Each structure stands twice: as C-alpha cells, then as structure tokens.
Amino acid sequence: MPTSVTASSSWSQILEMLLEGQNLPEVEATALMEAWLAEQLTPVQTGAFLAALRAKGVTGNELSGMAQVLRGACPLPCPLPDIPMVDTCGTGGDGADTFNISTAVAFTAAACGANVAKHGNRSASGKVGSADVLEGLGLQLKAPLVSVVEALVEVGVTFLFAPAWHPALVNLAPLRRSLGVRTVFNLLGPLVNPLQPNAQVLGVAKAELLNPMAEALQRLGLQRAVVVHGAGGLDEASLEGANAMRLLENGHLRQASIDSAELGLTRAPLQALQGGDLATNQAILSAVLQGGGTAPQRDVVALNTALVLWAAGLQDDLQAGVSTAKTCLQEGLPWQRLEGLRMALDHQIGE
C-alpha cells in the first residue's frame, strides 16, 4: 500500500516546497515515488514534480528514499547471491560520445576477480547504451531473470537489463520521453541495481552530483564505493587530468582526486576516447576486451577498473590495480568473460 502523504503536506504543498528550493525529508520523497508507481499522480503533476526536482537539485536523502522504493518493487526471481558484488553503472549524460567505457570495465574487473553485476539500459539519447552494444555482440537481453542471477555466480559477471527488472517504471516512460530532459530517474538508475551490490563505482557527469550521489550510496548501506567526476566532464575517470572523487568506506565519506599521470598512464584528451554508431562501439569494445584497441582506450579502462578493484576490496593500491587490469587486457581475459556470459545466457534461452 503506497505511503500516504502526511496530513500537513498535500501534493500541492510538497510541490510548493520544491519550487521554493526546500529539500524533501526522506519520508516524503518515498511517498512521492510510491505515488508515481501506483499511478496516483496525473501526468501534469508528475511533470511538475520532475521539473521542480531538477531545478532545485536533488539531495542524498531524496535519492535514497526514492531508490529504496524502486529496489523494493523489483521482481526478485530467486534469493540474492550470498557473494560480494560490485556495479559499474553511472548516470550518463556527459555528452562526450565516448565508447562504452563502463561496460568494458565491467568485464575487465570480472577478469581481475571481482563479481560484477552490471546494471544498464539502452541509450535514451540516440547514442549507444550498454544494452545496445552488448546485444549487438550477441548477449541475450531477454534471458530469464533467474538465469541472469545464476550467470553471476557461474561466470563472475552478469548484465541486468533495467526494463526487465523495473516493470513498475514502464508507465512513466512515455512522459519521461516527452519531457525531453534528464530527470531524477536518470540519477536513480545507478542506485537501484536489483541485486543490491555492496560496492560500486558510479560516474557522474556534473561535479555538483558528487555529494548527493555519494550520500545516497552511504544511506543505502554500501560498504565501499567511488563516485567520480572525470576531468573534462566525463562520467568516468578520464585521462585528461585530475578526476574528482568521493570515496565511501565503512560508512564514512571522504574527498579524493586522482590523475592518470600519477599512475603511470599517459594523459590523453577526451577525443581519444570517442565512440560512434553501434557498429563502431561494438568494434572498439571487442578490440579492447581482446587486448587490442588504442593505448588511450586500454588505459582508460585500466584506470576505471582499478577503481572497481578498490571498491570491491580486491586491491587497495590503485597503481597495482592499473597493472592488474592491464595484464588482464593484454591476455584477452575480459573477452573470455563476455563470451562466458553470452554462452551461459544462450544456454538458458535454448532450454
């Protein structure tokens, strides 16, 4: 049963709070999300709330309250695996048109020993999303949900196609598309992995999102996490300069930064990481995971993989993490993980 808005707070009063720049208590953010999922708000009300939240700027409390509702609405086909897990899902929206870096990182981190539950979707902007490129490489997006979970245990990596796990959001999709702007739902995507990993590397396209996203992960109970805003505005750690970070460890947040040059990597502009259409991004991802691609492409994957290995508790030294990732890439081990996942899901589809 959806939570009722408190007697003193009607929907119009909550909207007025947002329009005046006031932050919502977590309980009211929770009630708002529950009302959305229960279709209790009109399209006009929903559009107004989304616009007001975007204009005000979201807080960690608001994000965590909404995320908990969405997590609870996920259809879990089986008990959650009792293993440590890490996700590499970011917010997107940086406009840099890079290749699918976080997707490459997911398979590289798995090859380095992490259990990676990669949450992702198709692109909403006409670019190439993680689901688009993986489907193009033969990965089944419509595999039974239980098979997706089993693949994580079997292969060490899996891909959770967001629409399959969040059916409650289907009714909101047309309105979100009609608004034509990014909303709080774009920020919630990385926070609502159905398998609830205990670690995450989460890239944000804007520096002002570092704190609220990190605070949301903290409130959601993650053990370790990195929220990163890349030099040049990338929603990954980039090779262009100093990358701003918030590190979550044992319930505590701290600021940090890392420059790729400090880890022995050659600086490179964002243009060196450019992707393209689906065929181009498939070719780049295939090449990099098999030890090919350009030096900047491999280096940016190694850099971000090092952050994942830190978050997963596998490597506290980032320099060593970069070295481990480079070795895995040179040996083509990430491609083996992708092939293993593809075969595991194909097997289930065929049964």
Curated annotation (Swiss-Prot):
A GO term for molecular function: magnesium ion binding
Gene behind the chain: trpD
NCBIfam families reported for this sequence: trpD (TIGR01245)
Catalytic activity field: N-(5-phospho-beta-D-ribosyl)anthranilate + diphosphate = 5-phospho-alpha-D-ribose 1-diphosphate + anthranilate
Function in brief: Catalyzes the transfer of the phosphoribosyl group of 5-phosphorylribose-1-pyrophosphate (PRPP) to anthranilate to yield N-(5'-phosphoribosyl)-anthranilate (PRA).
Biochemical pathway: Amino-acid biosynthesis; L-tryptophan biosynthesis; L-tryptophan from chorismate: step 2/5
Entry binding sites for anthranilate 1: 90, 121
Annotated organism of origin: Prochlorococcus marinus (strain MIT 9313)
Cofactors named for this entry: Mg(2+)
Ligand binding (5-phospho-alpha-D-ribose 1-diphosphate): 90, 93-94, 98, 100-103, 118-126, 130
UniProt-listed HAMAP family: TrpD
Name of the protein in its database record: Anthranilate phosphoribosyltransferase
